[in-house]
Amino acid sequence: MRDARRSLVLAAVLLGASLGASACTAREGAAAAAPAGKVDINAPHATSPDFVTEPLWIESAAGRIDYRVEIADDDAERQHGLMFRTSMPDGHGMLFIFPQARPQAFWMRNTYMPLDIIYIGADSRIVSIQANARPFDETALPSEGPAIGVLEIYGGKAAQQGIKPGDRVHHRMFGQ
């Protein structure tokens, strides 16, 4: 009976060690499969790229609204965006810059705070706004037309500040 118990314990230990090694290998394999220079968006605590911060302002019926925005203008920065952040200072946001205007769609994977997603056309006008996008929701939130830029600000701020489709966004990316 004692030998049977020892065999059972040994089998359980070996099985546990084997499963642990498989999990490590799977994680390492996934990391190794990620292209060089890309952020692994599935990593639970992916390292945030170093974003440059620049001024941006919106010309609306309510007047001039100033923001400091982090710039996401390459694939790694655009893929990471505001994921894993739990807060954002008032008057701050992130501007995603794309090489050409086209229909865009964003989601809220690994995003802890609600956001207003503001789609901006090549003419610097707001095309559409997806207001109060829900944290962690992976539903695609599309633009209502081609967009070359996407501004993310804290959820509810666009309505609170009177920002609407048709308003003009001023930033260097629009030659302003």
What role is predicted for each listed range?
Residues M1-A12:
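Bacterial N-terminal signal peptides that target proteins for export
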Residues T25-Q176:
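Compact, glycine-rich, soluble single-domain proteins
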Residues G20-A23:
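C-terminal motif of bacterial Sec signal peptides marking the signal peptidase cleavage site
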